[in-house]
Regions:
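Short, basic (Lys/Arg/His-rich) helix/loop patches that form interaction surfaces
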Residues: 41-52, 62, 109, 124-130, ...
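Catalytic-site neighborhood detector that most strongly recognizes the C-terminal catalytic loop/helix
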Residues: 26, 34, 90, 116, ...
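Well-ordered beta-strand positions in beta-sheet-rich domains
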Residues: 34, 83, 106-110, 202
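Key DNA-contacting residues within the recognition helix of helix-turn-helix
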Residues: 2, 70, 177, 190, ...
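Proline-centered turn/helix-capping motifs that create local helix->coil transitions or kinks
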Residues: 9-17, 79-81, 120-127, 157-158, ...
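Non-catalytic DNA-binding core/recognition domains of DNA-processing enzymes
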Residues: 1-8, 111, 148
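Basic, Lys/Arg- and aromatic-enriched nucleic-acid-binding interface segment
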Residues: 10-72, 80, 91, 104-105
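C-terminal secondary-structure termini that scaffold catalytic or DNA-interacting sites
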Residues: 81, 92-106, 113-115, 133-135, ...
Length: 234
C-alpha cells in the first residue's frame, strides 16, 4: 500500500502521500519455551510405549532440530564413541536431504544415558533412517506433525489438556535450558545446539520461565515456589 501511494505521488496522480506518516504495527514473535516439570513427567511416561517415543526422547536429549532428526541414519549414531553425528537436515517443504545452512550445524552430540538404551533397542542397518515414515521414506513436515499430534493426544488422554504452545521445538529449547541449569558453559551449549550466533544461545540462557521465577522467589516468601503461596509480611 505504501509503495502504491508513493508511485502515485511521483506520477502526480495525487497531491500528497497519505501513507507517508503511517507506522506499521510491531509484530511480536511467538516465544519458544521450555517444558514444565509436569509436561516432562508426562512426556517421559508416554515415551515409554508410544510409537513416536524414541523420536520425542531424541529431541529432548539431543536438542536436534526436527529436520535434522528426519535426516538421521543409523550410521550417524556412533555407539562406539557414544555420539550422534549431525551433518544433514531435511530441506523445508520437501523430503530432500541436504547439508546444514551453516558450518555450525555440523556437530557431535554425546548420547544421553537415558537415550542410549532406547537407541540400542531400535538399532537398524547402518544407512537406514532412524525415523522413517511407515513407508520407509524421509519424514516431512506433515508426517512429523502427525507423529507429534498423536503423541499429544495420548498426553491429553492420560494427563488432561495440553498447552497449545507445546511444540517439538520446546524440547530443543528445553535441552538448552537443561544445559544451562547443569552449569554447562554458553560456548559449549552453542556448539551442541548448532547455533551460528552465540547470541541465540544467550537469549535462551538468560530467558527465565515462569516456573523458574516462582522457585527463586520461594527463597524469600516461603511459598514453595508455587503461584498463590503464602506470602510472609513484616
Amino acid at each position: 500500500l505504501q509503495e502504491m501511494f508513493k508511485r502515485a505521488r511521483q506520477s502526480r496522480l495525487i497531491p500528497y502521500d497519505p501513507a507517508e506518516l503511517l507506522s506499521l504495527p510491531t509484530v511480536t514473535k511467538g516465544r519458544r519455551r521450555s517444558i514444565t516439570e509436569e509436561e516432562r513427567t508426562a512426556i517421559l511416561r508416554i515415551s515409554q510405549h508410544h510409537r513416536a517415543g524414541l523420536w520425542i526422547l531424541t529431541l529432548l536429549y539431543t536438542g536436534m532440530r526436527p529436520g535434522e532428526t528426519a535426516a538421521l541414519t543409523w550410521a550417524d549414531v556412533d555407539f562406539e564413541h557414544n555420539e550422534i553425528h549431525v551433518h544433514a537436515a531435511k530441506e523445508s517443504g520437501s523430503r530432500t536431504i541436504k547439508g546444514p545452512k551453516t558450518a555450525s550445524g555440523v556437530r557431535d552430540i554425546p548420547i544421553h544415558a537415558a537415550l542410549l538404551p532406547r537407541l540400542l533397542e531400535s538399532r537398524g542397518k547402518p544407512f537406514s533412517l532412524v525415523f522413517p515414515t511407515k513407508a520407509g521414506t524421509v519424514q516431512n513436515e506433515s508426517s512429523m506433525r502427525r507423529m507429534w499430534n498423536s503423541f499429544i493426544r495420548e498426553m491429553e488422554e492420560e494427563s488432561g489438556p495440553v498447552a497449545d504452545d507445546l511444540t517439538p521445538y520446546c524440547l530443543r529449547h528445553t535441552f538448552c535450558t537443561d544445559l544451562q541449569r547443569a552449569g554447562v558453559s554458553i560456548n559449549v551449549a552453542k556448539e551442541l545446539m548448532g547455533h551460528a550466533d552465540i547470541q541465540t544461545t544467550a537469549n535462551i540462557y538468560t530467558h527465565k520461565d515462569s516456573e523458574t521465577l516462582h522457585k527463586s522467589i520461594a527463597l524469600l516468601d516461603g511459598s514453595g515456589g508455587k503461584p498463590g503461596g503464602n506470602v510472609k509480611v513484616g
